[in-house]
């Protein structure tokens, strides 16, 4: 038994090391890639100072943090709701952030600065989160709370569609592209949003013990002495914050929160002590690679990163499912 435990521990360490190396390679490639490829030897040249340090570095850091946040949010939701289909967009938080952003564009008549739009997106996400917490205080089961999140997401999606199709604002039309996800407008002015993600990410990665209990189910977690109501509220609030900040940075990005935790579980990473940091590393790596493809696929334009993540990730996920089912 002790030998098996040690073997599993070594395997987990190997996985984390491999994911760390993959993320580092993706980060370096992201800094080099673009219309003008700049190798590390030229990073401190005048051209490198502009393209690498002022343009690509803030974008790369934003992609890294958003990928980690979405993947961890997916792992948390799947444990919290005991549902393999749970992911950041399912609770309606992403759509709530979109409603906040569209309301800001309408009320501000397109004159609000980017930081104000970001705050409105976060506010929209947190409002949906507060509504979910209100439902949670009524001691609803996780399945009913999940359905409440789906209903809120549908309502928010309908509000966004009404606002977009009945508006003549050019800025509002452009939000349709933004809601498909993209990091094209990220620079150092959004660094406060990146900083806002870091403490919540680190805190959730340290909560492996309650997450392992939640993964056993409500009844087992309660029997083990876990204050279920408290942890449900805290995790929903933390997830709402991470998703709200992510949407404010890059728009709505699917697939990462749904598939990355699944892939790691299929690879044998089921303990949240390893799964949570693994999701952060794998989510960051996957979104960095998708962002590189979005930048390089077209010569004079940039693809929405949400389209890239779905196109590249769905076939991989189907292949893994078929392989696991043999």
Curated annotation (Swiss-Prot):
InterPro entries referenced in this protein's UniProt entry, alphabetically: ABC_BtuC-like (IPR037294), ABC_transptr_BtuC (IPR023691), ABC_transptr_permease_BtuC (IPR000522)
Which residue ranges are assigned to the Cytoplasmic compartment in the record's topology?
A: 1-10, 82-92, 139-141, 207-228, 268-274, 325-326
Q: Where found, per UniProt?
A: Cell inner membrane
What's its membrane topology? Multi-pass membrane protein
Q: What residue ranges are annotated as transmembrane?
A: 11-35, 57-81, 93-107, 114-138, 142-166, 191-206, 229-249, 258-267, 275-296, 305-324
Highest taxon, organism lineage: Bacteria
State whether keyword Transferase applies: no
| One GO cellular component term | plasma membrane
Q: What Pfam families does the record point to?
A: FecCD
One GO BP: cobalamin transport
Q: Which HAMAP family match?
A: BtuC
Q: What does this protein do?
A: Part of the ABC transporter complex BtuCDF involved in vitamin B12 import. Involved in the translocation of the substrate across the membrane.
Assembly and partners?
Answer: The complex is composed of two ATP-binding proteins (BtuD), two transmembrane proteins (BtuC) and a solute-binding protein (BtuF).
The identity of this protein, by name, is Vitamin B12 import system permease protein BtuC
């Amino acid at each position: 038994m002790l030998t098996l435990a040690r073997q599993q521990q070594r395997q987990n360490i190997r996985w984390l090391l491999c994911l760390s190396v993959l993320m580092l390679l993706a980060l370096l490639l992201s800094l080099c890639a673009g219309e003008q490829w700049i190798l590390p030897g030229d990073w401190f040249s005048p051209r490198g100072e502009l393209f690498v340090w002022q343009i690509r570095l803030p974008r790369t850091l934003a992609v890294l943090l958003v990928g980690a946040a979405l993947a961890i949010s997916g792992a948390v939701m799947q444990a919290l709701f005991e549902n393999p289909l749970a992911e950041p967009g399912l609770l309606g938080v992403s759509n709530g952030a979109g409603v906040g952003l569209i309301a800001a564009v309408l009320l501000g008549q397109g004159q609000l600065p980017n930081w104000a739009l970001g705050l409105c997106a976060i506010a929209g996400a947190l409002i949906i989160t507060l509504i979910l917490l209100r439902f949670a205080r009524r001691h609803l089961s996780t399945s009913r709370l999940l359905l409440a999140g789906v209903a809120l997401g549908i309502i928010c999606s309908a509000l966004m569609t009404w606002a977009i199709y009945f508006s003549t604002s050019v800025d509002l039309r452009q939000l349709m592209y933004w809601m498909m996800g993209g990091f094209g407008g990220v620079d150092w002015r959004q660094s406060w949003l990146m900083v806002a993600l870091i403490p919540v990410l680190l805190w959730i990665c340290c909560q492996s013990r309650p997450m392992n209990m939640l993964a056993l189910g409500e009844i087992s977690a309660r029997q083990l002495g876990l204050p279920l109501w408290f942890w449900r509220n805290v995790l929903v609030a933390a997830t709402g914050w991470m998703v709200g900040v992510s949407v404010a940075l890059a728009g709505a990005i699917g697939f990462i929160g749904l598939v990355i935790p699944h892939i790691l579980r299929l690879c044998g990473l089921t303990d949240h002590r390893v799964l949570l940091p693994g999701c952060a590393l794998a989510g960051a790596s996957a979104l960095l690679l998708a962002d590189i493809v979005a930048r390089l696929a077209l010569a004079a334009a940039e693809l929405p990163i949400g389209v890239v993540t779905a196109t590249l990730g769905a076939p991989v996920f189907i292949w893994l499912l078929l392989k696991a089912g043999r």
